A protein has these predicted regions:
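Acidic, divalent-metal-coordinating active-site segment for phosphoryl/phosphodiester hydrolysis
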Residues: 177-189
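Short, acidic/turn-prone active-site loops that include or flank metal/cofactor-
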Residues: 92-94, 116-118, 139-142, 198-201
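Conserved N-terminal beta1-alpha1 strand-loop-helix module at the mouth
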Residues: 1-88, 92-96, 103-106, 110-111, ...
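Acidic, Mg2+-coordinating phosphoryl-transfer loop and its flanking beta/alpha structural elements
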Residues: 189-196, 201-202
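Solvent-exposed beta-strand sheet faces enriched in polar/charged residues
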Residues: 66, 114, 173-175
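Short acidic loop-to-helix transition motifs that present clustered carboxylates
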Residues: 118-120, 179
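Glycine-rich beta-strand-to-loop/alpha-helix junction loops that act as flexible
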Residues: 174-178, 195-198
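Short acidic, Gly/Pro-enriched loop/turn segments at secondary-structure junctions
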Residues: 141-144, 188
Length: 215
């Protein structure tokens, strides 16, 4: 199966989100990655439900919505109504993870769980069969443009093995420091979905960058 590319809106020009969404919409990238940060779970604040709702009419691309927030259960319905297709919560932010995952699915969205760099893959074993996606953070969450953590490759391999052992059909996504010089290696180690922010929106030719990252 060809891998999926999800350009991250966090690295776009916030004064012209219409053009940024249009660029992705006109490209072969399959998803648009939306990073929602609350300034509590991570040391940054990005954007939220009103922005997602505003840009939803601009594209039919999959809205891959990554919640870096505390108490995500409170907002599941609101993100569905805003237009999220995939809703990913952090394992580290959920008290009752299984309940949260089931709430996401009950709204008709795909359910994802993300793990920070310090969280071992083994922490996902019980929940993995219930997931549509696992998001592996290859940088510490909160800011775009950070340096890629090399230990991510081992983590992807371990997750691929765990997925096979548990019979899960979850896609493996990686977010942070994805670029033209490592994207093929990430795929070889198990990634199905690549999130790319700076390497797309910070490139001299974003459309060419998307083509390269899909190769």
């Amino acid at each position: 199966m060809p891998h999926i590319l999800a350009p991250s809106l966090l690295s776009a020009d916030f004064t012209d989100l219409r053009s940024a969404v249009g660029l992705v919409d006109d490209s072969p990238a399959q998803w648009l990655h939306l990073d929602v940060m609350d300034g509590v779970f991570v040391p940054n604040i990005s954007y939220g439900i009103p922005v997602i709702k505003a840009i939803r009419p601009l594209t039919r691309k999959v809205f891959d919505t990554h919640l870096m927030i505390v108490d995500p259960d409170r907002y599941v319905t609101a993100f569905k109504e805003a237009g999220a297709d995939v809703l990913t919560v952090h394992l580290e932010a959920c008290t009752h993870l299984h309940r949260t995952v089931q709430a996401i699915k009950a709204q008709g969205m795909k359910a994802g769980v993300s793990i920070n760099p310090h969280t071992p893959v083994s922490a996902l074993e019980a929940i993995l069969p219930d997931l549509d996606l696992v998001l592996v953070m290859s940088v510490n969450p909160g800011f775009g443009g950070q340096r890629f953590i090399e230990g991510t490759y081992r983590k992807l391999e371990a997750l691929r093995e765990l997925r096979q052992r548990t019979g899960s059909g979850a896609l493996i996504e990686v977010d942070g420091g994805v670029a033209a010089d490592n994207h093929r290696k990430l795929i070889e180690h198990g990634a199905d979905v690549l999130v790319a922010g700076n390497s797309v929106f910070g490139a001299p030719d974003p459309r060419a960058a998307i083509t390269t990252l899909l190769s």
